Design a protein with these regions (language model features):
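N-terminal Rossmann-like NAD(P)+-binding domain of SDR-like oxidoreductases, especially those catalyzing
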Residues: 1-168
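Short strand-connecting beta-turns/loops that link adjacent beta-strands
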Residues: 8, 187-188
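Glycine/proline-rich active-site loop of Rossmann-fold NAD(P)-dependent oxidoreductases
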Residues: 143, 158-161, 168-181, 188-190, ...
Length: 203
């Protein structure tokens, strides 16, 4: 959606994705096919965990702004495959920061996560709340991203903005997200698992 909107307003958009198999790759391909209808959209397959590959692309293209939404997502999967999170969310994010530093970009916008709030019980959530107690490796990597971005902003003057997304849903959404799981269960006349004994409430 971000790439599509930027291309529509006239920006040249260069997309990077490793097209991993965390969820159905055909959905990712379909998204790309849709984006390729935009004249100003370019795509190259790349793993951000590979610094040399990412650096080569950045030196060739000379971007002026970076919107970093690539990451290994999913709280539960971080228990099953922790190394994927270190490679993508820690090493990959460091590689993005280094490329931004070398390019002297005007702004880095990156995806953090609401999961950083962890055991914080204060409601409603606030950007100034303590987020020092993540309860998953995924959340810990996102907290680390915020600290890394702050450090690079301080050291090298890179303007950075981190966005703590909550459950993202809508067209082209990930099939492992709650709205998609619920919708599929309803369509197939299956039960929907409710956690916390049904005692949850809106923030």
């Amino acid at each position: 959606h971000v790439a599509n909107r930027l291309a529509e307003r006239g920006d040249t958009v260069f997309g990077i994705d490793n097209l991993n198999e965390y969820y159905d790759v055909s959905l990712k391909i379909s998204r790309l096919d849709n984006l390729k209808k935009q004249a100003k959209f370019i795509f190259q397959k790349c793993d951000i965990g590979d610094y040399q590959e990412l650096k080569d692309i950045c030196q060739q293209e000379m971007f002026d702004c970076v919107v970093h939404l690539a990451a290994q997502a999913g709280v539960r999967y971080s228990i099953v495959n922790p190394h994927a999170y270190i490679n993508s969310n820690i090493q990959g994010f460091m590689n993005v920061l280094e490329c931004c530093r070398n390019l002297n970009i005007s702004h880095l916008v990156y995806a953090s996560s609401s999961s950083v709030y962890g055991e914080n019980g204060r409601l409603p959530f606030n950007e100034n709340h303590n987020v020092d107690h993540p309860v998953s490796l995924y959340a810990a990597t996102k907290k680390a991203n915020e600290l890394m971005a702050h450090s690079y902003s301080h050291l090298y003057g890179i303007p950075t903005t981190g966005l703590r997304f909550f459950t993202v849903y809508g067209p082209w959404g990930r099939p492992d997200m709650a709205p998609m799981i619920f919708a599929k269960a309803i369509l197939n006349d299956q039960k929907i698992d409710v956690f916390n004994s049904g005692q949850m409430s809106r923030d």
